[in-house]
C-alpha cells in the first residue's frame, strides 16, 4: 500500500494530485494524524462502499419503502447551525464587524483575532483524526470549470459528510483537472473525537458539542470546522464557502454571493422571467423555488433553492448560477400539499437526518399526518424511541433535513447547470411579518431596494438555535452568513449599479400577515403565483396596476388576479398603517445606527431619512 509519510493511502493516487493540493493534504495529515487517507472520486461505487460500511456500523439505515434512501439520527446535542461558535477571522476586527457603540453586541459577523484562532486550533486539531480515515473531497461549487464556479477541497473524518457532499456539490476526478495548479478553498473538518473515544457515542454519531468551532479565514480562503457532524456545520461547501467565503471573493472580484433562491417563471403567453429571492431560513424559499402555480397557464421551474452567485454580463444584465448540486431542505412541513415537487425530488438517492421512521420503512415528520396511509403505524422518532401519531412530543426534530440531488426535481430548469447562469429581472426580499407589512410592494429604486433589504426582519425559526416567536432583524437574509463588515457589504451592492448595467427591480413580499384573530390573511403556497404575476406585469411595464405608498408601490385594488380565490380582506392585506410604520421607522433607525453606525453608506442613510419623511407626511 502507498503511504504519505507513515500514513497509508487507502484509495487514490496522491502523486496525481495537483502540487498545491498535495502540500495541503500532507500538511494537514501531519497535523491531524489519521490512520489512513482516502481520496474520493465521487463514483457510485465509492458511495455504495461507504453506505454499506455505515449500515454495518449502525449510523445509516435504509428506508425500505424507497430506492436508495437512507435515514440517520444524530447525537441530540448536534442538530443545528451553531452561530455562537461560528467565527470570521481577520487581522482588523472592522473588516468583519461594524463599528457598534460601546455595550452593543454586533449581530452581523462574529469576529475572532488570528492569535485567538491559533490558540483555538492548537487546542483542537492536533491528533484529532487519530484512529479515523481522512477523506479528501475535491468539489466544485457551480458547474465544473464554469466562469462563475469555485473549487474547494474538503478534508473530513466523517463518512456522512462524504455521502452528503456528493449530493450537495459536484465531486469527482474532473475537479482536479479543472483545478490544475490554481488556488482552491481549503476546507478542514473533523468531528473532533479521536480514537480511542473516551465518551459514549450516541446513535453511532461521533461529535464533540462542547468543543465546536467553525472558523473562516477569508483572506486565506480557508475554513476550519471542529466538533459537529450536522450538515450546516460540516458540509463546508454550503453556507461557509458559498456564502461567507464567497461573499468575500465576490467583493474582491465584483460579483454577489447571496442567500437566494433562483426561479424561472413563464407567463401563459410563453414569456419567461428569472427571479432571485432572499428569505431568512424556514420562510419558504424552497416552497417558492418549486412553486406549483394555482393559476392556469403559468409555469415555474427551479434553478436553485438556497444560494445564488450573480455577476453582471457583457450585455449589462445580472446573471445567476446556483452553486449547489442538491437541496438540503427542512423536512417538517414539507408534504404533497405544501411542496409536491420537493417530495418528488427525494423519493430516491436521498439522505434524511433526524426524521421519524415508520415500521413500513417510510420517513415521517410533522406535516405528513394527512398523507400517511396507516395512521396507527408504529414509528421510531428522531430520538430512536417508539412513537405513534397522537403521542406527546415531536416525531422529527424541527430542523430535521433531507439532502436530495437537484437533478431529480421534476421541475428543475433545463438551464440550471448553464455555466454563465440565467438573467435576473427581479430580486424579492421577504420574511415572516405577522403585522403591518403588505403582501407585496415594489421598491422605488435600486438604492431604496437595498435599504429595504437591509431592513429585512422575520419571526425566528428552527434552523438556528434561537427560540421563541420574536421578530428578528435578518438583513438581506444574510445575518448568519455575513462574510464581512455589513456597511461595506451595502456599499458593494451600491457600487454594482454602474452605467450600462440593467439592475433588477427589487420587491418585498410577506405571505404571513395575520388578522385580529391571528388567522393568516393570505392562503400562500401555490396562490403566491398571483403575487408573482403582479410582479411580472410590473416588470413588463403594464400601466395602472400600482399605488404609491410611503414604503413603495403596492398593487392597486383589483390588480391582483383573484379569480377562484375565497374572500380575501384586500384592504387589510395591502394596508400600510401609519402608526405601525412610524414605530417601525424608529426601530429601523435605532437598529441601523447601533448595528452599522458610521459604516452605514450615506446613500442608505438618505433612503432612511426620505422614507421617514414620507411616512410622517402620510395622511
Curated annotation (Swiss-Prot):
Substrate binds at residues 81, 230-232, 281, 399-401. In parasitic nematodes PEPCK carboxylates phosphoenolpyruvate to oxaloacetate thus introducing the products of glycolysis to mitochondrial metabolism. The lineage of its organism: Eukaryota, Metazoa, Ecdysozoa, Nematoda, Chromadorea. One of its GO terms (biological process) is gluconeogenesis. It comes from the Eukaryota. Keywords: Decarboxylase, GTP-binding, Lyase, Manganese, Metal-binding, Nucleotide-binding. Mn(2+) binds at residues 239, 259, 306. This is Phosphoenolpyruvate carboxykinase [GTP]. Monomer. The keyword Nucleotidyltransferase does not apply.
Amino acid at each position: 500500500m502507498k503511504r504519505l509519510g507513515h500514513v497509508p493511502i487507502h484509495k487514490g493516487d496522491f502523486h496525481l494530485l495537483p502540487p498545491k493540493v498535495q502540500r495541503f493534504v500532507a500538511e494537514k495529515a501531519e497535523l491531524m494524524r489519521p490512520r489512513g487517507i482516502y481520496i474520493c472520486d465521487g463514483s457510485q461505487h465509492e458511495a455504495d462502499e461507504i453506505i454499506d460500511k455505515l449500515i454495518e456500523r449502525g449510523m445509516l439505515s435504509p428506508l425500505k419503502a424507497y430506492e436508495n434512501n437512507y435515514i440517520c439520527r444524530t447525537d441530540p446535542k448536534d442538530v443545528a447551525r451553531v452561530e455562537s461558535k461560528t467565527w470570521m477571522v481577520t487581522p482588523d476586527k472592522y473588516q468583519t464587524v461594524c463599528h457598534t457603540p460601546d455595550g452593543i453586541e454586533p449581530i452581523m459577523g462574529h469576529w475572532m483575532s488570528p492569535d485567538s484562532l491559533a490558540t483555538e486550533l492548537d487546542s483542537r486539531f492536533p491528533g484529532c483524526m487519530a484512529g479515523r480515515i481522512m477523506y479528501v473531497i475535491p468539489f466544485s461549487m457551480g458547474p465544473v470549470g464554469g466562469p462563475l464556479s469555485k473549487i474547494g477541497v474538503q478534508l473530513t473524518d466523517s463518512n456522512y459528510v462524504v455521502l452528503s457532499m456528493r449530493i450537495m456539490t459536484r465531486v469527482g476526478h474532473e475537479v482536479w483537472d479543472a483545478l490544475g495548479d490554481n488556488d482552491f478553498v481549503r476546507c478542514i473538518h473533523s468531528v473532533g473525537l479521536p480514537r480511542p473515544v473516551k465518551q459514549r457515542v450516541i446513535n453511532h454519531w461521533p461529535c464533540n458539542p462542547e468543543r465546536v468551532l467553525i472558523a473562516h479565514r477569508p483572506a486565506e480562503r480557508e475554513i476550519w470546522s471542529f466538533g459537529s457532524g450536522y450538515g450546516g456545520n460540516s458540509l463546508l461547501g454550503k453556507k461557509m464557502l458559498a456564502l461567507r467565503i464567497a461573499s468575500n471573493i465576490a467583493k474582491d472580484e465584483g460579483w454577489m454571493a447571496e442567500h437566494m433562491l433562483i426561479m424561472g417563471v413563464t407567463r401563459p403567453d410563453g414569456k419567461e422571467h428569472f427571479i432571485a429571492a432572499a428569505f431568512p431560513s424556514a420562510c419558504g424559499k424552497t416552497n417558492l423555488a418549486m412553486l406549483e402555480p394555482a393559476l392556469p397557464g403559468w409555469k415555474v421551474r427551479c434553478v436553485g433553492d438556497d444560494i445564488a452567485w450573480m455577476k453582471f454580463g457583457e450585455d449589462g444584465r445580472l446573471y445567476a448560477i446556483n452553486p449547489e448540486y442538491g437541496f438540503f431542505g427542512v423536512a417538517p412541513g414539507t408534504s404533497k400539499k405544501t411542496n409536491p415537487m420537493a417530495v418528488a425530488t427525494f423519493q430516491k438517492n436521498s439522505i434524511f437526518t433526524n426524521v421519524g421512521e415508520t415500521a413500513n420503512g417510510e420517513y415521517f415528520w410533522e406535516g405528513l399526518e394527512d398523507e400517511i396511509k396507516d395512521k396507527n403505524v408504529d414509528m421510531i422518532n428522531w430520538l430512536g424511541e417508539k412513537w405513534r401519531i397522537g403521542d406527546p412530543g415531536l416525531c422529527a426534530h424541527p430542523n430535521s433535513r433531507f439532502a436530495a440531488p437537484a437533478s431529480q426535481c421534476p421541475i428543475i430548469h433545463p438551464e440550471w447547470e448553464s455555466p454563465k447562469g440565467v438573467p435576473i429581472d427581479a430580486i424579492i426580499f421577504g420574511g415572516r411579518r405577522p403585522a403591518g407589512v403588505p403582501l407585496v410592494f415594489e421598491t422605488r429604486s435600486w438604492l431604496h431596494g437595498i435599504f429595504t433589504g437591509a431592513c429585512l426582519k422575520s419571526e425566528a425559526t428552527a434552523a438556528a438555535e434561537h427560540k421563541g416567536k420574536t421578530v428578528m432583524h435578518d438583513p438581506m437574509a444574510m445575518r448568519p452568513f455575513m462574510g464581512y463588515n455589513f456597511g461595506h457589504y451595502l456599499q458593494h451592492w451600491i457600487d454594482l449599479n454602474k452605467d450600462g448595467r440593467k439592475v433588477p427591480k427589487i420587491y418585498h413580499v410577506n405571505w404571513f400577515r395575520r388578522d385580529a384573530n391571528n388567522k393568516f390573511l393570505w392562503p400562500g403556497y401555490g396562490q403566491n403565483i398571483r403575487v408573482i404575476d403582479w410582479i411580472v406585469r410590473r416588470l413588463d411595464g403594464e400601466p395602472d396596476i400600482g399605488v404609491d405608498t410611503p414604503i413603495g408601490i403596492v398593487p392597486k385594488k383589483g390588480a391582483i388576479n383573484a379569480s377562484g380565490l375565497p374572500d380575501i380582506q384586500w384592504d387589510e392585506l395591502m394596508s400600510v398603517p401609519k402608526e405601525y410604520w412610524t414605530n417601525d421607522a424608529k426601530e429601523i433607525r435605532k437598529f441601523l445606527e447601533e448595528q452599522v453606525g458610521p459604516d452605514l453608506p450615506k446613500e442608505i442613510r438618505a433612503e432612511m431619512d426620505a422614507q421617514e419623511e414620507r411616512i410622517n407626511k402620510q395622511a
